[in-house]
Amino acid sequence: MDEELQLKNWTELHNHIKSVLDRLDESRINESFQELLEVNVIRGRGILASEVVREERVVRQGAVLGALVELFEDYIPELGIMVSREALLLFLKSFRGGRTKYCYGLLALLCQLCNSDVMHEIGLLQLADLLLEVPRDRAVGMLCFMLGQAGAHLMNVCRTAHDQLLARLTDMLHDGKLSPTSSNRIQELLRLRRSNYKGQATKFSLPDHGVCTHRVTLELDIPARLEPDSSLGKFYVDNQFFDTEERFAALRRQALERFLGQQQQQAEPVKDMTNAEEVQYKKQIYLILKGSLTGDEAAHKLLKLRPDASQKATIVEIVVKACAQEQTYTKFYGILAERLCGSHRNWPTSFTNLFRDLYGTLHEFEPNQLRNMGKFWGHMLAADHIGLNLFECVHLSEHRTTPSSRVFLKFIFQELVADLGIAEVRKRLEDENAQPLVQGLFPKEGNADTVFAINYFTAIGLGVLTESMRTSLPTQAKSDSGNMSPNGQTLSYPSSRVPRRTRSRSPPRTRVRGDSPQRARVEQRYSRYDPGPAHRDRRRSRLSVTPPPRRNIH
């Protein structure tokens, strides 16, 4: 076949491979594999390898590309060698050139190839040694990322080298010469190691396939061999064009028969719409809470479950709702929440997220539940396990609060004052760092919301906390800030004392039925108040009342 026709075929091959990879994502790995088999990937393996390691593509989905290369291992093993070697060389070049994002994408690709046994682990260990030679923050971050993605695989196949890498990172952490960001990354990696890297490696749903492990290494002593292959993906004339077509036809038939046969054998997965696992997990958490004598015991049992991020959110929700269902608030739940927040930094985040979710649905809770939850959150704030960023979702105004939310906030602040004292609470709220977090709770614009907030805190007995808000009011409003409505009108609050009813001078009416001695005595007693018909006529005409003559009683 002449060169011009081969070049046209090459261009069509390149465009097809590029379009398939552009549409690639985690849900289309198997479909992309079938679409690539529509063209001669034996001839285009160089194009496929060069497109896989392209910077803009690797940065976005390095691990997904590694899974796609893994599927071709049983049919075109040369592709795994080309991609592994090119990714190693490009990482070395990009790291020296300071292209950090590209380095992280290549690391994700290499870790996926190593986890699936396409590439031998010696390549990753060489990269780890190179990163440790320059213990800068950038190198430490990449090394922690690599161990987070492939640490479980390295621990299984080369435990000694894996432990040595962790020991080096631990020594660097203890030296104290790293930035806080790098120190936090190392600490997070050590926590992952204690959990045996649970849930860290990316797993894809792939059909059964064979794998051939390639021992690809960097020849560091020969600088000329450390440059990426510039001819990868370039056009070349295939002198055995038709033989290559026959080989690909046989390969494609074998691959599709195996691939489609497995899809037919696989039954349609049953999706559990009853959430039975979630219900069972919640039941287990509830039984732990009810079967524990102290909050410390409950926290110990819950932490032994080693929950992930989503399970932590479930546990936090059950703890708060179980506290709300109690007859009265008990410190059991407060101590439990303290122990959970002190064990890992993700727990306070889960509690904060739950507070924001519950605050919008407070109208669904009963008054007793509002009291228990308010005291719970007040206890957590007083214990300083949750910050004042809890109040970022609170806007204290007449139109943005409900009676339920006002009652809820009242119990929070009353619990805070009971635990810390009014002086300490005021000190925390007036701190400069806390002002942006509580500006919705203590508005200082000098408008109706400010007046409403002042009246609210004054009504619940915490008017001391409103001193900073009163300074933002106009002069006339300052004098009436305790008795002003949100519309600016002066409010007259009734006294807490109920005034006594004025006693009437007229005698009480006594109803006596029938003729009896009692009726005679009553008429005789009240006869002095009836001056007679003549006097009544004079009173109507003169509009004056002449009191009856008093009788002298000796």
From Swiss-Prot:
The keyword Lyase does not apply. Residues 14-196 form the MIF4G domain. GO terms for molecular function: RNA binding. Residues 498-511 have a biased composition (Basic residues). SUPFAM superfamilies: ARM repeat (SSF48371). GO terms for cellular component: catalytic step 2 spliceosome; cytoplasm; Prp19 complex; U2-type spliceosomal complex. Residues 473-493 have a biased composition (Polar residues). It is found in: Cytoplasm; Nucleus. It holds the Pfam family MA3. Residues 473-554 are annotated as: Disordered. Keywords: Cytoplasm, mRNA processing, mRNA splicing, Nucleus, Spliceosome. Residues 512-528 have a biased composition (Basic and acidic residues). InterPro entries: ARM-type_fold, CWC22_splicing_factor, Initiation_fac_eIF4g_MI. One of its GO terms (biological process) is mRNA splicing, via spliceosome. The keyword Manganese does not apply. Residues 280-396 form the MI domain. Belongs to the CWC22 family. May be involved in pre-mRNA splicing. Associated with the spliceosome. This is Pre-mRNA-splicing factor CWC22. The gene is CWC22.
